[in-house]
Design a protein with these regions (language model features):
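Cyclophilin-like peptidyl-prolyl cis-trans isomerases
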Residues: 1-206
Length: 206
């Protein structure tokens, strides 16, 4: 049994791509549902043969949802957003960290993930001050006073993106991917690698 205060073992995985291997570790103690969801997709071999379909050099690389013909893979039900608890535990959208992609609905993440290629603090959940109502809250230059706490907790723009792991080796591969030429592809008008960047497999190594 782990000692008191010791975190759970961080699962280590290898993302094998046609550009090289990326090693990652995940943090089930900080984002348990997110990590369990990702590991289930790995076990199901969902990611094998998918592509990084969205590559923006000074932002992130995103994949895990489409094959090389831009056909969307079937996915399970979305998971609960865990961004706030993950950030409280120290995880942020910094260079080399993995986060779940989603729609405007914070609780819509399924299989797609992204790797931050720069520090993206604006993707982090917005901290909400103590109190109910919250006496003073500032957001993007606007100051709000005496706001019911529930309103802030449910404000879609404050959720951010759930970070659940980081790259431990292979950032050279990530950087190679992020600088690949992009353009149109399938249903996407921009940011698609002109030469497909394929995830051959994601496997547990520990």
């Amino acid at each position: 049994m782990p000692a008191i205060g010791q975190t759970q073992d961080a699962p280590k995985l290898k993302i094998a791509t046609n550009q090289g291997d990326i090693l990652i570790e995940l943090y089930p103690d900080k984002a348990p549902k997110t990590v369990a969801n990702f590991l289930q997709y790995v076990k199901d071999k969902h990611y094998d043969g998918t592509i990084f379909h969205r590559v923006i050099p000074n932002f992130m690389i995103q994949g895990g949802g489409y094959d090389a013909q831009y056909k969307e893979r079937s996915m399970r039900a979305p998971i609960q957003h865990e961004g706030r608890q993950a950030m409280t535990a120290g995880l942020k959208n910094q260079t080399g960290y993995l986060a779940m992609a989603r729609t405007n609905d914070p609780h819509s993440a399924t299989a797609q993930f992204f790797i931050n290629t720069v520090d993206n603090a604006f993707l982090d959940p917005t901290p909400i001050p103590d109190g109910d109502p919250v006496k003073r809250f500032e957001y993007r230059g606007q100051v709000y006073e005496n706001v019911p706490r529930e309103n802030l907790l449910n404000a879609l723009q404050l959720f951010g993106y759930t970070v659940f792991g980081k790259v431990t080796a292979g950032m050279d591969v990530v950087n190679k991917i992020r600088t690949t030429p992009t353009g149109m592809g399938g249903p996407f008008r921009t940011d698609v690698p002109k030469t497909p960047i394929t995830i051959l497999s994601i496997t547990l190594v520990q």
